[in-house]
Amino acid sequence: MRINPTTSGSEVSTVEKKNLGRIVKIIGPVLDVAFPPGKMPNIYNALVVQGRDNEQTNVTCEVQQLLGNNRVRAVAMSDTDGLMRGMEVSDTGAPISVPVGGSTLGRIFNVLGQPVDNLGPVDTNTTSPIHRSAPAFIQLDTKLSIFETGIKVVDLLAPYRRGGKIGLFGGAGVGKTVLIMELINNIAKAHGGVSVFGGVGERTREGNDLYLEMKESGVINEENIPESKVALVYGQMNEPPGARMRVGLTALTMAEYFRDVNEQDVLLFIDNIFRFVQAGSEVSALLGRMPSAVGYQPTLSTEMGSLQERITSTKEGSITSIQAVYVPADDLTDPAPATTFAHLDATTVLSRGLAAKGIYPAVDPLDSTSTMLQPRIVGEEHYETAQRVKQTLQRYKELQDIIAILGLDELSEEDRLTVARARKIERFLSQPFFVAEVFTGSPGKYVGLAETIRGFQLILSGELDGLPEQAFYLVGNIDEATAKAMNLKT
């Protein structure tokens, strides 16, 4: 991994002899800059606009095109208000570089790696460029292994792959943020890992809410910031398209350092991957490229691949990525989600219906899928248990119309037993979270995969048919459910 040791930890690497150009054209966030003959900067180099009297205006741009006639076209990473033709632009000689390492934990950064949380400068002298190639084949760890989350519904029915990519589908208010925070908490405790959250084109309010909730739940430790378990990188929807297009790479670069240098398991959240594509589409239009299908950029697959292929397991560690996916107009054939799906190993679908019932986490057990749920990967016992759970829930779903019209009494004895077990399974799929202790009062539970399988096998076998279904609601393992049933009887 290429690391730039610097003395200041600034957002761009500096070179001794400045290569200076001048702005000749400004169109919104796009600048055309003329350089002296033979001094053209490379593609992806960071340029810094100099203010009058050598004052920096703090506008950093990234070279996107070499136009000929000693001119380059660059995209700004912040607002271009106040810029004028003739202003000096200095070529830094390197791509945008951002701080990396343990001192990034508990902090909020923008696309340039500058802290935006008013907690002072980042205590590090190590930076890394945001553009790099994916790991070579020889470095990859091709072994298929399950990434245990300690969340029953995920581990049993749609297990995550270590170093894989997971799509998280959910609307507002169904518990997406709480699920994200629980995953961050569990990876820190069970795997000794850290997390990086990349807010790509999201609402400023949502980013602020997530930060405050993380502080409240202890994921970010206010008293001792370095003890925190997550670094946050935000490029909000009010920022120029250049910033929104590159903020995912900034977050990924921080995650890669933890994987390659610290040799840790890293969880990388990207919310929302669609906004990354959308920003790329805006930049593509500004650069004058001919649009492709549905108005998207012609380089859609390449841009998505350059991000996704860097998210992988190596011999040193792993980056497991959870990406929120917005589906425009619920059209799964839209080029943006369709391109994303090609890279996903699992999908976790959050259901408003389950959230309305109070089943948390509100993960839909029938809609969520995983390529890992195969007997040769998870073993026969896990696979058979998961399939029987899904069959029971599917049968219950089919019977719900009959129950609504005629009532339970009209069902056959076998169907009534199926419904009773399905309702127990549905409730047993709920679980108290560590990060929700603050407002539920129930201590959180981490349930290992073996315990999860044992619990569902006992429900399916009929051994627990005599227990009331409310005993299975918001408990950890099956022993807690039986103990709760005893308390309900007394």
Curated annotation (Swiss-Prot):
EC number: 7.1.2.2
This protein's record includes keyword Nucleotide-binding: yes
Protein's membrane topology: Peripheral membrane protein
Cellular component annotations (GO), alphabetically ordered: chloroplast thylakoid membrane; mitochondrion; proton-transporting ATP synthase complex
Pfam families: ATP-synt_ab (PF00006), ATP-synt_ab_N (PF02874), ATP-synt_VA_C (PF22919)
GO molecular function: ATP binding; ATP hydrolysis activity; proton-transporting ATP synthase activity, rotational mechanism
Enzyme category, top tier: translocase
UniProt xrefs under InterPro entries: AAA+_ATPase, ATP-synt_VA_C, ATP_synth_F1_bsu, ATPase_a/bsu_AS, ATPase_alpha/beta_chains, ATPase_F1/V1/A1_a/bsu_N, ATPase_F1/V1/A1_a/bsu_N_sf, ATPase_F1/V1/A1_a/bsu_nucl-bd
Biological process according to GO: proton motive force-driven mitochondrial ATP synthesis
Record keyword NAD present: no
Record's keyword terms, sorted: ATP synthesis, ATP-binding, CF(1), Chloroplast, Hydrogen ion transport, Ion transport, Membrane, Nucleotide-binding, Plastid, Thylakoid, Translocase, Transport
First-listed, main subcellular location of the protein, grouped into a coarse class: plastid
SMART domains membership: AAA
CDD domains in the record: ATP-synt_F1_beta_C, ATP-synt_F1_beta_N, F1-ATPase_beta_CD
Catalytic activity: ATP + H2O + 4 H(+)(in) = ADP + phosphate + 5 H(+)(out)
PROSITE patterns: ATPASE_ALPHA_BETA (PS00152)
Localisation per UniProt entry: Plastid, Chloroplast thylakoid membrane
Family: Belongs to the ATPase alpha/beta chains family.
PANTHER family with a match to the protein in the record: ATP SYNTHASE (PTHR15184), ATP SYNTHASE SUBUNIT BETA, MITOCHONDRIAL (PTHR15184:SF71)
Protein name per the record: ATP synthase subunit beta, chloroplastic
Name of the encoding gene: atpB
